């Protein structure tokens, strides 16, 4: 019968460093699922459309970088083993989103945001602090963050032309996954943040979206 491996604090720190490198280095994230865009036809996009869609996908890619860092920070400080496992599992699913977004950005002849290391560090710190407060707050932060991501995805789906079926397929699958992450966090006992806290989080999200759209 297999036994669960127990990691020392140093082991976990090294694993976190490895995850950070795989998140931030180009082409280093290996998705477990193929991109939904693979089976979709190419669209005849003009230069302005391609540039705008690339900007939106860059925002989504950075959002996934932040989510990955958030989950890793929370997993590092989670008090209950089952909560830590849930965070690590969610982080694994976010790798798919990271890879899909990067692939699409490259197809549009653009690049991920140069600000990703900054946002990774900030999000990791926030996640670790939330985990130190309590698992309930940590899970609640996941739910609130994922709901914010879903809102961004909805806004982007409204802006992306219907003929760009590749980008739309990616965002639609991401939305399904993110909504599931949010609901799972609440079902696991996550705290439902009040409106003022959610509003503050939305303001921080706007800083990220405005800055990463172009760089």
Swiss-Prot record:
Needed cofactors: Fe cation
Catalysed reactions, semicolon-separated: a 5-methoxy-2-methyl-3-(all-trans-polyprenyl)benzene-1,4-diol + AH2 + O2 = a 3-demethylubiquinol + A + H2O
Class of enzymatic activity (EC top level): oxidoreductase
GO biological process: ubiquinone biosynthetic process
UniProt-recorded Gene Ontology molecular function terms: 3-demethoxyubiquinol 3-hydroxylase activity; metal ion binding
Binding, Fe cation 1: 64, 94, 97, 178
Pathway info: Cofactor biosynthesis; ubiquinone biosynthesis
EC number(s) given by UniProt: 1.14.99.60
A GO CC annotation given for this chain: plasma membrane
Cellular compartments annotated: Cell membrane
Pfam families, sorted: COQ7 (PF03232)
Name of the protein: 3-demethoxyubiquinol 3-hydroxylase
Species, as recorded: Pseudomonas putida (strain GB-1)
The encoding gene: coq7
């Amino acid at each position: 019968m297999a036994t669960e491996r127990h990691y020392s604090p140093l082991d976990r720190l090294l694993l976190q460093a490895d995850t950070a490198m795989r998140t931030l280095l180009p082409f280093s994230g290996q998705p477990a699922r193929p991109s939904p865009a693979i089976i979709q036809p190419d669209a005849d996009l003009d230069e302005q459309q391609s540039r705008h869609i690339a900007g939106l996908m860059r925002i989504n890619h950075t959002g996934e970088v932040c989510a990955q860092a958030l989950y890793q920070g929370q997993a590092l400080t989670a008090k209950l083993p089952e909560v830590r496992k849930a965070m690590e599992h969610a982080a694994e699913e976010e790798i798919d989103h990271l890879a899909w977004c990067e692939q699409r950005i490259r197809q549009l002849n653009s690049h991920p945001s140069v600000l990703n290391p900054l946002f990774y560090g900030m999000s990791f710190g926030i996640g670790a602090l939330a985990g130190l407060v309590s698992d309930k707050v940590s899970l609640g932060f996941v739910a609130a963050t994922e709901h914010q991501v879903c809102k961004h995805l909805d806004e982007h789906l409204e802006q992306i032309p219907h003929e760009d079926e590749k980008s739309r397929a990616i965002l639609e699958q991401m939305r399904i996954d993110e909504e599931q992450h949010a609901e799972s966090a609440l079902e696991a006992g996550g705290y439902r943040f009040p409106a003022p806290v959610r509003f503050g989080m939305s303001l921080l999200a706007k800083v990220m979206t405005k800055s990463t759209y172009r760089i």
